């Protein structure tokens, strides 16, 4: 009996070990599959600096004038300190920036969306922007009040992109069969994408005000569903080295992660030199970023940018 029990226990143990190995191997395959899946999405890269140098001086000046970005910032009353920081920092570099709030706020000028639902706020803001500014701006950039954006880098990234084509870009995320641009890093739509989205906003079957599921899905996923019906698909924005330029984390957190995973290349492993956005910032961090991006210079280092994007008329930006 003892030998039979012993054999039985050995069999159970061996079977358990075998099952554990199969599970581990399965996870390895699944994980690898996810990594492969991550690279199936569309990639959009910034232009090479060499290409910019080939452009004549007159063409560069025309480009700097013609690139116009309209910035949409979705805010709520609880975000008032972030709202103030965003208003005083990077939005001054947009050709025009407007704040869309969930309710009327006396402290700052904003466009009242009269709803607390983020998806409804986003829909209304996009419709307002397209109806009013479709003939004045080529690109529409939407962000949270926790996002810091370097608009000049955004313009540089978009330099060779045609706004009459349906672009929808930022930091892409895969969720089942749906690929979407995460709102944390900011969302960019060309005027053609805005046109297509606007044509669907009144068609509930294709772009419902509420998701067609029992549970609520996030506003950035809702947007992706609507745009998919319009033939507009999410594209991941990267620099020439394949690094993301729309970041869903702050610089501090990105550096902390780089110190863990790339201890010998912290700066190189952290972020792109041409980063467009960072997210998750406090009001103080907004001002620190503003100083670092637009004011701090190393003596003796000369920056020879081949193209300069002119600030909006009457702007008091840095």
Swiss-Prot record:
Q: What does this protein do?
A: Probable chaperone required for the generation of 1 O-glycan Gal-beta1-3GalNAc-alpha1-Ser/Thr (T antigen), which is a precursor for many extended O-glycans in glycoproteins. Probably acts as a specific molecular chaperone assisting the folding/stability of core 1 beta-3-galactosyltransferase (C1GALT1).
Location of the protein in the cell = Membrane
What does the UniProt keyword field contain?
Chaperone, Disease variant, Hemolytic uremic syndrome, Membrane, Signal-anchor, Transmembrane, Transmembrane helix
Q: Subunit notes for this chain?
A: Associates with core 1 beta-3-galactosyltransferase (C1GALT1), probably not with the soluble active form.
Similarity comment: family membership: Belongs to the glycosyltransferase 31 family. Beta3-Gal-T subfamily.
Which loops or segments lie on the Lumenal side of the membrane, by the record?
Answer: 27-318
Additional facts recorded: Defects in C1GALT1C1 in Ag104A cell line create a tumor-specific glycopeptidic neo-epitope. This epitope induces a high-affinity, highly specific, syngeneic monoclonal antibody. This is caused by the abolition of function of a glycosyltransferase, disrupting O-glycan Core 1 synthesis.
Q: What is the effect of changing residue 152 to K?
A: In TNPS; loss capacity to promote Tn synthase activity
Indicate the disease this protein is implicated in. Tn polyagglutination syndrome: A clonal disorder characterized by the polyagglutination of red blood cells by naturally occurring anti-Tn antibodies following exposure of the Tn antigen on the surface of erythrocytes. Only a subset of red cells express the antigen, which can also be expressed on platelets and leukocytes. This condition may occur in healthy individuals who manifest asymptomatic anemia, leukopenia, or thrombocytopenia. However, there is also an association between the Tn antigen and leukemia or myelodysplastic disorders. Hemolytic uremic syndrome, atypical, 8, with rhizomelic short stature: An X-linked, atypical form of hemolytic uremic syndrome, characterized by microangiopathic hemolytic anemia, thrombocytopenia, renal failure and absence of episodes of enterocolitis and diarrhea. In contrast to typical hemolytic uremic syndrome, atypical forms have a poorer prognosis, with higher death rates and frequent progression to end-stage renal disease.
Reported effect, residue 131 to E: Retains capacity to promote Tn synthase activity
Give residue spans on the Cytoplasmic membrane side. Answer: 1-6
Tell me the tissue specificity. Answer: Ubiquitously expressed. Abundantly expressed in salivary gland, stomach, small intestine, kidney, and testis and at intermediate levels in whole brain, cerebellum, spinal cord, thymus, spleen, trachea, lung, pancreas, ovary, and uterus.
Topological type in the membrane: Single-pass type II membrane protein
Give the matching InterPro entries.
C1GALT1/C1GALT1_chp1
GO BP, one annotated term? platelet morphogenesis
What parts of the sequence cross the membrane?
7-26
Protein name per Swiss-Prot or TrEMBL? C1GALT1-specific chaperone 1
Taxonomic lineage: Eukaryota, Metazoa, Chordata, Craniata, Vertebrata
Superkingdom as given in the UniProt entry: Eukaryota
GO cellular component assignments: extracellular exosome; Golgi membrane
Q: Which organism is it from?
A: Homo sapiens (Human)
């Amino acid at each position: 009996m003892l030998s039979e029990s012993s054999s039985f226990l050995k069999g159970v143990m061996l079977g358990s070990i075998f099952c554990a190995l199969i599970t581990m191997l399965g996870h390895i395959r699944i994980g690898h599959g996810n990594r492969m899946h991550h690279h199936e999405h569309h990639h959009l890269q910034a232009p090479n600096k060499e290409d910019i140098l080939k452009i004549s001086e007159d063409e560069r000046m025309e480009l700097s004038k013609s690139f116009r970005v309209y910035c949409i910032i979705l805010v709520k009353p609880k975000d008032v300190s972030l709202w103030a920081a965003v208003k005083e920092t990077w939005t001054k570099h947009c050709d025009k920036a407007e704040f869309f709030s969930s309710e009327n706020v006396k402290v700052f000028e904003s466009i009242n969306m009269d709803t607390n639902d983020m998806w409804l706020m986003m829909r209304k803001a996009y419709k307002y922007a397209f109806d009013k500014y479709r003939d004045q701006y080529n690109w529409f950039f939407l962000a949270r009040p926790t996002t810091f954006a370097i608009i000049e880098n955004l313009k540089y990234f978009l330099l060779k992109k045609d706004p009459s084509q349906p672009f929808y870009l930022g930091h892409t995320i895969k969720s089942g069969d749906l690929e979407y641009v995460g709102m944390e890093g900011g969302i960019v739509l060309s005027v053609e994408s805005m046109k297509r989205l606007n044509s669907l906003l009144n068609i509930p079957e294709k772009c419902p005000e509420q998701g067609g599921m029992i549970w609520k899905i996030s506003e950035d996923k809702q947007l992706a569903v609507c745009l998919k019906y319009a033939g507009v698909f999410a594209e991941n924005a990267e620099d020439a080295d394949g690094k993301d330029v729309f970041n869903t984390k702050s610089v501090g957190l990105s550096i902390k992660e780089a110190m863990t995973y790339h201890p010998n290349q912290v700066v190189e492993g952290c972020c792109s030199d041409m980063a467009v956005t960072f997210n998750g910032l406090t009001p103080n961090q907004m001002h620190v970023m503003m100083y670092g991006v637009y004011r701090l210079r190393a003596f003796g280092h000369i920056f020879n940018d081949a193209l300069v994007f002119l600030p909006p008329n009457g702007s008091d930006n840095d």
